[in-house]
Amino acid sequence: MSPSIVFTGGGTAGHVTPNIALIKEFRKEGWNVEYIGSVSGIEKEMIEPMDIPFHGVSSGKLRRYFSLKNLLDPFKIVLGIIQSSLLFYKIKPDVVFSKGGFVAFPVVVGAWLNRIPVVAHESDMSPGLANRLSFPFVNKICLTFDAGKKYFKRQDKIEVTGTQISSQLLTGNPMKGLEVCRFISSKTCLLVMGGSLGAGSINSCIRSALKQLTSEFQVIHLCGKGKLDSSLVGVEGYCQFEYANEELADLFAASSVVISRAGANSLYEILALGKPHILIPISSQVSRGDQIQNARYFQGLGISVVIQDELLKADVLLQAVQDVMRKKDEIDNKIKALKIESATDKIVAIIKEQAHVQTPRIV
């Protein structure tokens, strides 16, 4: 009988894309794979095309700010735990892997109630709320950065691994990327990414600076679902996508500089691909500040050029692009010195090891 694994994680693509890299590895080795996510999250549309059984459960948002919706969240979380527990009783997987996000906590607790071992993964410098709450119920947690260890009491549960990256992303073809965009090879390409949901401030800034940017560069713009600007279709040197899946590796390969939010997964991919970059972290007014922390760390190493979201304007962005181009060789060398690589093999080994470990009855 083939071993089985359940994956969970969702809310944004950053909690799903790393799972996809692992799913491909486990399917290649003959494991049965299923996924538990939120009922209406982005994870469903990302996972279902892979022909994997998807189960939606109730989940609370785990907000850190006051909202009347917070009054309902505990009930949603309890319902999610019950639904997950019943699913696990039926599926009986050997192990569960959690990538975090608000759906993960009820799934992790449901697995613990069924004595199913859980391996979690945290991408950021400091753990998100879902992983903080899940920590007592997991067997192991894999961290991207060593700096994250200080936030957890049980050091024996921690493995610093890095982040899993799809092997496909590392083998992009620059000529194919240029061909998709109908670009020429003699002009430098910039790749702009605002995350799976898009980034309004980045989109607006790129479009306001487009005339100046395209006079010197070619711009590949991943602007988010529903965020395309029809008035810019056909502008020479500019190619916009809602998001990129199969072609993302080629678009990365075609680009010399990346402009991006500072989510840990995207940042890790950018570093693994050795791309000089500009980071525009989400403001702490609308987030827990994890992207700011990620960006500051690599800015301190002289690797990342960082623009505060509140200060993002066309002239500031144009100056940052010029700064990166001027220091490109220096930045290239500093990124190479980090020796960032995909952690897929390490994490797969930990998951397999924990599949045979008894889950403790007391947290």
From Swiss-Prot:
InterPro entries: GlcNAc_MurG (IPR006009), Glyco_trans_28_C (IPR007235), GlycoTrans_28_N (IPR004276). Pathway: Cell wall biogenesis; peptidoglycan biosynthesis. It is found in: Cell inner membrane. UDP-N-acetyl-alpha-D-glucosamine binds at T12, A13, G14, S196, Q291. Belongs to the glycosyltransferase 28 family. MurG subfamily. Cell wall formation. Catalyzes the transfer of a GlcNAc subunit on undecaprenyl-pyrophosphoryl-MurNAc-pentapeptide (lipid intermediate I) to form undecaprenyl-pyrophosphoryl-MurNAc-(pentapeptide)GlcNAc (lipid intermediate II). NCBIfam families: PRK12446.1. This is UDP-N-acetylglucosamine--N-acetylmuramyl-(pentapeptide) pyrophosphoryl-undecaprenol N-acetylglucosamine transferase. It comes from Legionella pneumophila (strain Corby).
